[in-house]
Structure formats: structure tokens, C-alpha cells
Amino acid sequence: MSQTEHHISIEQEMRKSYLEYSLSVIIGRAIPDVRDGLKPVHRRILFAQQELGNSYTRPPKKCARIVGDVIGKYHPHGDSAVYDALVRMAQDFSMRDPLEEGQGNFGSIDGDAPAAMRYTEVRMSRLASEFLSDIDKETVDFRPNYDNSLEEPIVLPTKVPNLLLNGSSGIAVGMATNIPPHNLGELCNALLKIIDDPDVPIDNLLNIIHGPDFPTGGFIYVGQGLYDAYTKGRGTVKVRGKVEIEERKKGAQSIVIREIPFGLNKSSLVEKIAILVNERKIDGIADLRDESDRKGIRVVIELKKGVIPEIIINALYKFTPLETSFGINMLAVVDNRPQLLTIKSALTYFLDHRREVIVRRTRFELNKAEARLHILIGLIHALDHIDEVVNLIRSSSTPAEAKIRLIERFSLSEIQAQSILDMRLQRLTGLEREKLEEEMHELQTKIAWYESILGDTKILWGVIRDEVTGIKEMYTTPRRTEVIRETLTNIEIEDLIPDDDVVITLSRRGYIKRTNLAIYQQQRRGGKGVAGLHTSEDDFVQEFITTTNHQFLLLFTNKGRMHQLKVHQVPEGSRTAKGTHIANIVPLEKEEWVTTILTVREFSDNKFFLFATRKGMVKRSSASYYARSRRTGLLAVGLREDDELIMVKEVTNNDFIVLATAEGFAIRFSCEDVRNMGRGAAGVKGIALRPGDSVVACLILQEKQDTPAIMTVSNLGYGKRTSIDLYRVQTRGGKGIINFKVTQKTGLVIGAKPVSDDNALVLLTSTNKIIRMSVDEVRSAGRATMGVRLVKLDDGAYVVGFDTVDGTVDDSCDDATINT
């Protein structure tokens, strides 16, 4: 037997097969039809329910029964896909106007899964019945099902503009659709407008259709994005949830979320808020709980006392899905091809569909009426000659003979003759004759009406208008999504925070807080100001900066990294509060701590930072290099092995730099000796250290600063103040001069600071004791001296740190504030 071989190109075959697959997905699965707004699975579900009699007037049926009929007769796919579609059609948070009425667990807005289909029951909603109205009147075409055993409708003869009413979303091959739901009343008004004026501009329709109307409510911001979506088919709109502010006892307030954006999982939103609170990205929330019930959504966010609720609301919109973007892509199947639609074209295609349905329905009704009228004419004619008809029938030997004789004698059609033969004897009464004549006149009136519809376009559109008006009056519900006619701009949190003067304090143990400066100013009028300078008995303030809320706060660590945040992001604390550990605000590595904090309002090329390291390196860099930062921090200075950053200061060319070492040496040089270098540079040598020595302090002496002396303190409690004039200016990189006579008795130098006579000194020991004294109690001495004993230490104890404060210190420590 001969065989015929056909050689085909694999490239052509793959192109052909992929195109067929793509069209199958587009037309048969993922993209809705512009006429009824349904995908095949939804259309088959509704038709199967129609065939089962599962209407809104009858008791619901098990979902398993519906799903079984759909996959067995029309939709040869998995049962889960059909059940998921059926469930979604019953969810009032997924569909603007649900097409199913469900009984049982059909899932929730929290993302809970529905119960198994064997437990749930469903029936079509009253609105869904309008999708199938007149389907038995040849209004739409049918096609064979997948095994040619039954027929299914290609499209439903819906009276409802479902494509825009409930919207649709789906992903096909190389394309996707995402159409938002709308308000039925607005859609019907737009349809009526197009019926009255087919050439109406789209802009006029936009005055009728105000925007999407989501089942979950919320706010929608109408701007260019929505205009593009309605006029071009693609655009993006901003959607926000709706919140309220409630007053609580003792002046506290709560934020209550009542509506959320469409498609958002409520439990995921609550979880996201909780995560942000734990990560301290949103501060000021005391409690968070979900009080939602069958009456609606209610997520309560209790605020701490004194927190401005508008700030938290803005943070929720900024950091959580409470504000989302809805991308509109109005793609639908038109004449078996995907097409991008405008709002007007979508409505026009629906009206064209309604016109075709009404024309086909009218023709069906006309044919039916004419057929019935034809029979009635024959029956009435027979009644006019009833005696002759009866005799003719009685004299005939068979029904077939009687039919032929009736046709020949009275010029009847076969249908008329058969109707006469089928007529019951009771029809021979006079009353029945009157009924037949009355029915004939009614049919003649209907036929005239049907013919007028088919013959007059105005009458046809009048019928469509009446049906649209009826749907509007029957099913319209109030708008749920509030439209705000303005483009949403991202409001920064700073816009809601006043740029007040504040104080940032960082303790030696790493606790940081932000306090309003007015509290310290009030305290100086009679309170114990020093109470605001330490966080606990074993800690004291290391950094104290007066700044404003809107400035940038730069935190430099010993490992040479910089973290950047806004001042207002530092948690606020009272004057006596301990504060928040810095590790809870910025990520720190093991054995890493913040050594210096600076604040700047802008990162100018003319502003410079000076960096000093433990190994005597110094670097001057432009502040503009540090304008950007990352979540994990930014490399601020390149450190060599076993080196660490000890201080960063803002400097000018006129400043002088003093480096002090642990072995008691110091060097003073001009800032101009340190050239401007890049962010990752290690710097240049500031002082040549002797073996085993290290830098413990870096002082910036401003040209006009009134600090006549340098206070130097050792770890065994000795200290002295020395006039700045005794430190001559040297060349950078030298070994320096003696600053402090280090002996076994004094121990090593732990630090040095510029002071004046009206300053006070605060020392912290290893046994957690804090000692305070006035600077003028420490006698002035030369450079090559060891000073005096500042504190008597217990055996094994040592001084771990010290700082200076403005104001003398008496027994009550009144009026003392940290030296800035």
C-alpha cells in the first residue's frame, strides 16, 4: 500500500498551532464577550442553571449539581475552575451586582476559602434572569457542545450591560483585560443618552458615568488616568480605602477603616499594618484589632495619646495597600477578535446586541402570531359552515380523507384542516366562537405592532429605551465608591508635621529620643533640667543636638557606615523617658554602634564633614556625597584594618582640628590641610601615632568659638583643663605635642573636649556612678601635667566616659543642659 508523505516546516506548524492556541485562550477562556460581558465558563453556568430551572423563584440547588451539569454538558474542564467561577458570581465583595444567591460558606473578604461544593447551595439572582430572558425565542445562535450531543448559546440575550456593570479581568496569551465595575444607574443613563444621540461625544458621557463603582466602596480619584481609560481604553486610577476618626476616653483617638480598595484581602491589610508597627515604620499606634462582622468592615487602630491621626492615616495610605492603583485595560472580544474599547464603544456594542436580540425576538413573535392567526382563520371559517364540515367529516372513511376533502372544499391549508380535525366539540358553542374572534383581533393588533417594530427604526429604539429604563428602575442601587475629581498627589508625611524645634539625645548605651525643645526651655525656668540628660543610673547623654523636625538626621557608626532618616522619624519621648534603642530604628551589625549624629537641612557642595578614626586618619568630604542612603546604610568612610570611626563633625576651611590620643599626645592643624575626598576614601594621616597609641578625641575649634580651654580626662579619674593657646598649630601628619602626662597613676586618656568656665562636667564610671562638677572646680594646668583627681574610684573601677553641659552644677543640678 502506497503512503503519501507531506513535508511541512516546523516553524510554520508551530506558528499555526500557537496562533490557534492563542485564539482559543482569548476567545474561549480569558477574555469576555463585549455583548454579554461573560466568559464562556460564566455563560455556561447560567445556561445550565436555566436548563435545571435553578431560578430565583425556586429553591436553591447544591453547587455540586450545578458544577456537574456544567462540566458534563458544556465545559470539559476541572470542577474546581467551574466552582471557583460560581463562587465568585455569588460574592458581594467581588461582584458589583452578584449573579448568584448563595447559601452557605462562599468565602470572605479575608481570603477564607469557600466550603466544598457538596455543602453549598446556589440559585440565580433576579438580575441573572435578565441575562437569559427570551433565550427560547431564537434571539441568539446556538452551537454544538464539545461532544455534539447538546447545544449551547454562543452569547446570552442579556438586557444588562454586564461588561461594564461587573467588569472583568483575565490574562490571555500576549494580552490581558481588566475592566472595573460600574454603577448600573449611571450605565443605563449613558445608554439612554446614546439612544437619543448616537453621535454624543465621550466627554458628555463622562458627565453621566462618574467612574468605576467598586463593591467594596472606597474613594476613587478621577484624573487623566481615568480619562485615558474611557477615551483610549487604557489608564490607571488611584483607589483608597475609607477611614474615620473616632474619639476615645481621655483625649485619645482611633482610626477606623470602614471600606477597603477593590480586590484587597482585609486580613493581609491588617497583617501588613502590624508588620509596619513592629518594624517602627509607623509609630504612634497603641493597638490594632479587626472588629468586622456581618454589618461591614471595621478595623480599629487605636492611637497613642498626642498622636496626630492624619499623620498615621497618611502613613497607612503610603505604606500599605489601603491605597492602590487600578490599571484599566478595556479589552473584550468583538466579532471573535480581541478589541480595545472606549467607554462609548462598549456601550454601543451592547446596544447593537440588544437591537439584534429584539429584532430576532420580534420576528419570532411575529411568525408565531401569524401562524396562530392562520389557524384561527381556518377555525372560524369552519364554524361558519359547521353543519357542512361535520357532515363532510362523518362521511369520510379516514382522517386523511377528511383532511383532503376539507382542503378542497373550503380552500384550507393542511395546518388549518388539521386544526379543524383536532378541534374539540366544545368549540362549537357560540361562546367559544366569540373567544376565537377576540383572540384573532388581539393577534392582528400584535402583528401590526411587530411589523411596526421591524419596519420603523424609531419604534425599535423606543422598545430598547423602554427596556433599559425598566432595568434601571428595577435594579439600580446607590453608588458605593465616592468619586473625588482631582488627581491624587502623594502627600509626604512632613506636610502634616510642623517643623518645630526639637532636641535629639543619644545616650552612651545607644538610646535615642526626640523631645520638643519647649520642654527644656520651660525646665530651665525652675525645674531640675539635668533629669532630662540621662536615661538611667548607668547611662548618660553622649550626643545632644538642637534641630527641627524636617531636617535630615545622619547617624555614623564606628564601622564607617552612615544611616539617614528624618528627625521626625525618631520616636518622641518625654524629658525623663529612656528612649528607643538605636538598633530598633536602623540596622546595626554585631559590635557596631553609633558614634556621632549630625543634622543637616540640605546636602550642599559647600558644606563639609570631617571624619576622624581611631588610627589617626582624617578625611574631609562634601555633604553632597551623603545625600542618598540605603536601608542597610551607606559607606561613609573607607576604614583600614583594625580601625574605626570615632567622630564626624561639620567643618569650614577656617576651623582648626585637634586630635588627642590615649597616650597623652595631641596635634592641632588647620582644616585646610585636609583636602576634599570622595565618600569611600580612607582619608589622610592626621597624626603619626606611636606604637600602641590611638586617637580618643577629635575637637573642632571654630575661629570665633568662645572655648578658651581643652578638658582632658583619664580613665583613672584624673583631669585638667589647658588653655587652647598652649596648642600651637602644626602640620597635619606630625607626632604632635604632649597634651596630658600619662602615668600609671592617671591611666590612659579617654577623651578631650573644648570647655569654658561656665560649663559643667558629667562623668560616668564603670560602677554606673555619675559624678557632676563645675568646670571652674578643675584648676587650669599646662600641657605636660597630669591634672587633678576628679573622682575617687572604687577598687577596680574606672571612668568610661564624660561630657560637658552648659551652666554650673550645684547640689540640685538646676538649669543644666547638654553642651551643643
Curated annotation (Swiss-Prot):
Q: What Pfam families does the annotation carry?
A: DNA_gyraseA_C (PF03989), DNA_topoisoIV (PF00521)
Annotated catalytic residues: 119
PROSITE patterns, per this entry? TOPO_IIA (PS52040)
Q: What is its EC number?
A: 5.6.2.2
Keywords associated with the record? ATP-binding, Cytoplasm, DNA-binding, Isomerase, Nucleotide-binding, Topoisomerase
Question: Sorted alphabetically, which InterPro entries does this protein's record hold?
Answer: GyrA, GyrA/parC_rep, Gyrase/topoIV_suA_C, Topo_IIA-like_dom_sf, Topo_IIA_A/C_ab, Topo_IIA_A_a_sf, Topo_IIA_dom_A, Type_II_DNA_Topoisomerases
Q: Which reaction does it catalyse?
A: ATP-dependent breakage, passage and rejoining of double-stranded DNA
Q: Where in the cell is it found?
A: Cytoplasm
Motif (GyrA-box) on chain: 523-529
**Biological process, per Gene Ontology:** DNA topological change; DNA-templated DNA replication
Quote additional remarks: Few gyrases are as efficient as E.coli at forming negative supercoils. Not all organisms have 2 type II topoisomerases; in organisms with a single type II topoisomerase this enzyme also has to decatenate newly replicated chromosomes.
Subunit relationships: Heterotetramer, composed of two GyrA and two GyrB chains. In the heterotetramer, GyrA contains the active site tyrosine that forms a transient covalent intermediate with DNA, while GyrB binds cofactors and catalyzes ATP hydrolysis.
Role summary? A type II topoisomerase that negatively supercoils closed circular double-stranded (ds) DNA in an ATP-dependent manner to modulate DNA topology and maintain chromosomes in an underwound state. Negative supercoiling favors strand separation, and DNA replication, transcription, recombination and repair, all of which involve strand separation. Also able to catalyze the interconversion of other topological isomers of dsDNA rings, including catenanes and knotted rings. Type II topoisomerases break and join 2 DNA strands simultaneously in an ATP-dependent manner.
Cite the NCBIfam families for this sequence. Answer: gyrA, PRK05560.1, PRK05561.1
Tell me which family the UniProt entry assigns to this protein. Answer: Belongs to the type II topoisomerase GyrA/ParC subunit family.
This one is known as: DNA gyrase subunit A
From what organism does this protein derive? Lawsonia intracellularis (strain PHE/MN1-00)
Record gene name: gyrA
